[in-house]
């Protein structure tokens, strides 16, 4: 347990979170602009959850020894990983059990104070259909891979929530 406490208070732990999520975001942009796979509105929402993980890693890496910074990072991490898993599962259900009554919107519904689709339409404007499964790897769709990734982030969050929020009194090497 003490190793988890120590690791959660190191900048490298938070940078691993940030760069792994950055890799997912880079993959999404590769699929969109190199492989020409159009993202659906649910894919855009999942992309926002990945950005939440990037932000969580960035916040946590600023000053990981301070409890309040770890708390903010852990909060962003928990919300983003759970929300991403929920969205990935909903999209998987739409693709696995297609129904004409269960479709997704063509336009994202971002809050008026944060219209990401207007600010950065090249990243946050959906152009695809939720029911399409344009890519698979090892018999799993992109949606299933994102679900696996978010479940992994959620499990890692659950492993780190308790040790990450424990207060560890700094030791004085001169005493």
UniProtKB/Swiss-Prot annotation:
Q: Which GO terms describe its molecular function?
A: electron transfer activity; protein-disulfide reductase activity
Give compartment(s).
Answer: Cell inner membrane
Instruction: Tell me which family the UniProt entry assigns to this protein.
Output: Belongs to the DsbB family.
Name the predominant localization: membrane
Mind telling me which residue stretches traverse the membrane in this protein? 14-30, 49-64, 72-89, 145-163
- Its domain of life? Bacteria
Which UniProt keywords are present, listed alphabetically? Cell inner membrane, Cell membrane, Chaperone, Disulfide bond, Electron transport, Membrane, Oxidoreductase, Redox-active center, Transmembrane, Transmembrane helix, Transport
Question: What is this protein called in UniProt?
Answer: Disulfide bond formation protein B
InterPro entries, per this entry? Answer: DiS_bond_form_DsbB/BdbC (IPR003752), Disulphide_bond_form_DsbB (IPR022920), DsbB (IPR050183), DsbB-like_sf (IPR023380)
Q: In its keyword annotation, does this UniProt entry include Cytoplasm?
A: no
Q: How does it sit in the membrane?
A: Multi-pass membrane protein
Tell me which parts of the chain lie in the Periplasmic compartment. 31-48, 90-144
């Amino acid at each position: 347990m003490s190793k988890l406490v120590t690791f959660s208070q190191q900048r490298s732990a938070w940078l691993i979170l940030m760069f792994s999520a950055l890799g997912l975001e880079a993959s999404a942009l590769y699929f969109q602009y190199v492989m020409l796979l159009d993202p659906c509105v649910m894919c855009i929402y999942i992309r926002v959850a990945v950005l939440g993980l990037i932000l969580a890693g960035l916040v946590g890496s600023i000053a990981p020894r301070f409890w309040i910074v770890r708390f903010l990072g852990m909060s962003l991490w928990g919300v983003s990983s759970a929300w991403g898993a929920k969205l990935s599962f909903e999209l998987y259900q739409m693709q696995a059990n297609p129904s004409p009554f269960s479709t997704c919107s063509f336009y994202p519904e971002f809050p008026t104070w944060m219209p990401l689709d207007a600010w950065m339409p090249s990243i946050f404007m959906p152009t695809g259909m939720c029911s399409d499964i344009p890519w698979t790897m090892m018999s799993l769709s992109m949606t299933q891979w994102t679900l696996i990734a978010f479940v992994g982030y959620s499990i890692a969050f659950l492993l780190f929530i308790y040790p990450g929020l424990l207060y560890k009194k700094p030791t004085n090497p001169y005493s």
